[in-house]
Every structure is written in C-alpha cells, then in structure tokens.
C-alpha cells in the first residue's frame, strides 16, 4: 500500500469525518481517480508529436495512455473525424496515490517561482483540475530527448459533494494551495 493511501486511511479520513460530522464512513470524501490529458492539435500535421506524447505520458503515469480521436470534423482546423488529437491516461488505486505523492513532493516544487496552486480550480462537485505548462518538470522526462515542450491537464476526481470538502481533502493530503 502506498504511503499516501496509508496517510489517508489513518489520519485524513478520521479528521474529515470529525470536521464535517459524517455519520457513515462511506460519506467521507476520497480520491476516485486521476486523469492525465494532453491535447495535441499539432498532431494533425505531424504524427511524430503524437508518438512523443505517448512515450512521455507513459513515463509520467507509469501506464500506456489511450490515443483520443476527434469526434467531429472541423474544416477550419483541417480536422477529420477519427483523427488522433490527444492522449489520456486514467490512474486508479495505488498508481493514483503514488502519482499524487510524486506530484506534491517532487514535481510541483520543481516549478519555477512556485507559490502554490490555485484554490479556485474546482468544478463545483469537489473535483480539481491542474494545468501544467511544460512536461519537463516531471523527473522522468529527459530534457535532451524531448522534441517539443507540451503541457498537460491533471484532473483529480474525488467523491466529495462540494468544493469545500474536496479542497479540505486535498489540503490534508498535502496539496500546496496558494493562500
């Protein structure tokens, strides 16, 4: 079992139950999944960008990502239905906890001028989305081997009913929110 999961079970869950007054242990908010997504509009012209993104997201997430395809054709973007336009990976269970632990303790401190992440990026249902501008902040990515700096979105999906519960859960798990 990962260290973050142990921390959640032993310290965070009882604290949340006490703070919000849950009568049932199943009401306590918990993490359900982490979704990593790279949107690659440039992949329409250059297929190598897509291959590089698959390799990088595999290194970052520890599992092979799924190539996402366009749902509709858009003539202005020279896009046809079914063309590959991104990659996504969904992490659950131990991989999710390991990734979050690495994100909080190793990756985010490597960001230049890092003062914490925005506490406003919740969606109203307790889920948090974090945008990363460059994939080179991850320790697995070799700076010399990347062809293009690409960003990615990290969505942390929780079972929290509202933003307040989700924010408290992530704060107790160590997410460095800006004051």
Curated annotation (Swiss-Prot):
This is Large ribosomal subunit protein uL5. It comes from Desulfatibacillum aliphaticivorans. Transmembrane segments: none annotated. The gene is rplE. Keywords: Ribonucleoprotein, Ribosomal protein, RNA-binding, rRNA-binding, tRNA-binding. Gene3D superfamilies: 3.30.1440.10. This is one of the proteins that bind and probably mediate the attachment of the 5S RNA into the large ribosomal subunit, where it forms part of the central protuberance. In the 70S ribosome it contacts protein S13 of the 30S subunit (bridge B1b), connecting the 2 subunits; this bridge is implicated in subunit movement. Contacts the P site tRNA; the 5S rRNA and some of its associated proteins might help stabilize positioning of ribosome-bound tRNAs. GO terms for molecular function: rRNA binding; structural constituent of ribosome; tRNA binding. Part of the 50S ribosomal subunit; part of the 5S rRNA/L5/L18/L25 subcomplex. Contacts the 5S rRNA and the P site tRNA. Forms a bridge to the 30S subunit in the 70S ribosome. It holds the Pfam family Ribosomal_L5. InterPro entries: Ribosomal_uL5, Ribosomal_uL5_bac-type, Ribosomal_uL5_C, Ribosomal_uL5_CS, Ribosomal_uL5_dom_sf, Ribosomal_uL5_N. Belongs to the universal ribosomal protein uL5 family. GO terms for biological process: translation. GO terms for cellular component: ribonucleoprotein complex; ribosome.
